[in-house]
Amino acid sequence: MNRIDAHGLKIAPVLFDFIAGEATLRTGIKPDAFWAGLAAIVRDLGPRNRELLAVRDRLQARIDDWHRIHKDTPFDISAYTAFLTEIGYLEPEPETRQIETANVDDEIGKICGPQLVVPLTNARYALNAANARWGSLYDALYGTDAIAREAGEAKGYDKARGDKVIARAKAFLDMATPLANGAHADVAGYSVLNGRLSVTLRNGDTTGLKAETQFAGYQGDANAPSAILLVNHGLHIDIQIDRAHPIGRHYSAGVADVIIEAAISTILDMEDSVAAVDADDKVLVYRNALGLMNGTLTDTFEKSGKTLTRALNPDRVYTAPDGGQLTLHGRSLLLIRNVGHHMFTDAVLDQRGAEIPEGLLDAAISGLLAIHDINGVSKRRNSRSGSLYLVKPKMHGPDEVALTCELFARVEAMLGLRENTLKIGIMDEERRTTVNLNACIQTASKRVCFINTGFLDRTGDEIHTSMEAGPMIRKGEMKTQPWIKAYEDWNVDIGLIEGLPGRAQIGKGMWAAPDRMADMLAQKINHPEAGATTAWVPSPTAATLHALHYHQIDVRKRQQELKAGGRRARLSDLLTIPVSHSNWPPEDVKQEIDNNCQGILGYVVRWIDQGVGCSKVPDIHDVGLMEDRATLRISSQHLANWLHHGVVTHDQVMDSFKRMAVIVDEQNAGDPLYKPMAPGFDSVAFKAACDLVFRGREQPNGYTEHILTERRREAKLMAQAARAFSGEADTGSPRENATRQ
């Protein structure tokens, strides 16, 4: 590659051209000024980035030594806590101080609801997520197991199933927006009279809403509106009325659908759900982000023999009760997740020819792209408060948060953005951040817009941090351990006392089974009940259904109750290490190995061979689960731990990998791009899976990215060589990195 030199940086041509020809257009930023600013950031902050990574390694070595020394003595939580304090792992908790974050959008500070995470490498999925602000409740109930399917249901539209859906939707309306008299199922017609909702029942009586303030607006003629807009707990409900519609003509009041606010916010992901290993991949990520920031992104595709084009939805316009115009945001508020401090990219090399910290590049380009939105260039405005929300993952403690804040300040200065334009979302997914969360938040007190728990990454770090303490319990038992409950409560407790409500989100993790919506409806209500203002969902449909929970729970009221009750989580529980003192029967050990190996292979083979960073992967029981690098981290670290402590042998794990490869091959038999791993077991993907376990203990903090990146680059080079040998044009990856939802 003939790199382009700019201010001491050596830049991949594809990235250089993107900045000059696309990213800087209509921003007022000259490409040369951008590279000069980035060069200064790399020069000044690059060494600090590397030093903080060295601190991680030094602390891990000290902890490993402590566990080796105390291996044959009963675990002493007091001695352990004192040790963590002595080495600087556990820092003094600062006095409580309210955050000062300003200029946040209502989706961050006021509205509680679901949050999507979508890979930025796939334009169509990113557009679907951005447009998932509003979702059809009828479709979500009809098309999933939220309502159990009966034997003999008709193909296409089944009237009996449709009746159940409509009954469920009307029961929801009765719960969220009850009438003063009667039920929504009894309504013969909706109209607007003197700025109030007038409801005619089938018996001829007239009523209204029990709480008249829940009427927010309408579309069409006041006497025969085409839509009625209601609101509950800050979330809007759009009752679509069309008596000529195939659904509406069969039911009272002509209700054709109930559209509800669903994905209030969406994280555009540059990190765990993408496989971006080189400059070409990074430019794909950045180009899609640009299209979302300036409102021009489209995606054209074939479906059922038709050519369809997706674009960002417009805002929704209603007549307000007072006769004025009410405009509601038509799209999910977009946040961007950059990579962590531990990642480096060859898209740009420094003066020494070394890869630069990838997070520096992500922050600089994210800030540049946001100018298209902040300065009003965008056709579809994202932030109306003039902020950019950057989620920063995998930070270890307040010093690393401080580095991110300084980086954001430098980006603002180089781009001429208002101070504190760049907000920080703190992923509470590493153990040292958890135990020092109060200090982390205060370090970013003028920028923090989000804290979030992530069970899987957090468990991966739990295992790696205490690798020398002993064999860990079985993976499925982790959610019952004292540390995990303390972790979830600790995050909310600290978020409340630090004053996040009204200024920042308090988030919870992903529902990983996109086909099990009945289970999600039964279980994920726990997140708003826990005081979380948002929680992750795997699809737009899941967002629509999870939104129902925020109508059931008044999160702001629940937060006040929790805050009044005082802090619940204890540090001693948080530091309780999930080691096992059991001897498992051989069949349990085999089951654990097989489950882990199958999950690792099912995810890694798509990552390496096809560049798919997040997808629905069938587990060993053929249940589709959303997999990304977080799920891979826990599985690989768990097996590495059991190997290290002699619970399993190298031969047992390798035997399982080979048996599971056959199963994974069978599960992917319908994919024309899939490359089988059996019977040779010598593919790059199979080797990568083995590396993740057999080299797992030596990976910094148990991260999987370094091995995946190394092996994906190898696979891409092999594919390029094969195309060159056959005389084919080099078209890159056979498939965009995509979430199969």
Curated annotation (Swiss-Prot):
Subunit structure: Monomer.
Cofactor(s) needed: Mg(2+)
EC class (word): transferase
InterPro entries: Malate_synth_C_sf, Malate_synth_sf, Malate_synthase_TIM, Malate_synthG, MS_C, MS_N, MS_N_TIM-barrel_dom, MSG_insertion
Presence of keyword Cytoplasm: yes
Reactions catalysed according to its record: glyoxylate + acetyl-CoA + H2O = (S)-malate + CoA + H(+)
Binding site for acetyl-CoA: 117, 124-125, 273, 310, 538
Enzyme Commission number: 2.3.3.9
Residues bearing PTM Cysteine sulfenic acid (-SOH): 614
Name used for this protein in its record: Malate synthase G
GO MF terms held by the record: magnesium ion binding; malate synthase activity
Binding site for Mg(2+): 429, 457
Pathway: Carbohydrate metabolism; glyoxylate cycle; (S)-malate from isocitrate: step 2/2
Main location as per UniProt: cytoplasm
Active site (UniProt): 337, 628
A Pfam family it matches: MS_N
Biological process per Gene Ontology, one example term: tricarboxylic acid cycle
Function: Involved in the glycolate utilization. Catalyzes the condensation and subsequent hydrolysis of acetyl-coenzyme A (acetyl-CoA) and glyoxylate to form malate and CoA.
Residues where glyoxylate binds: 337, 429, 454-457
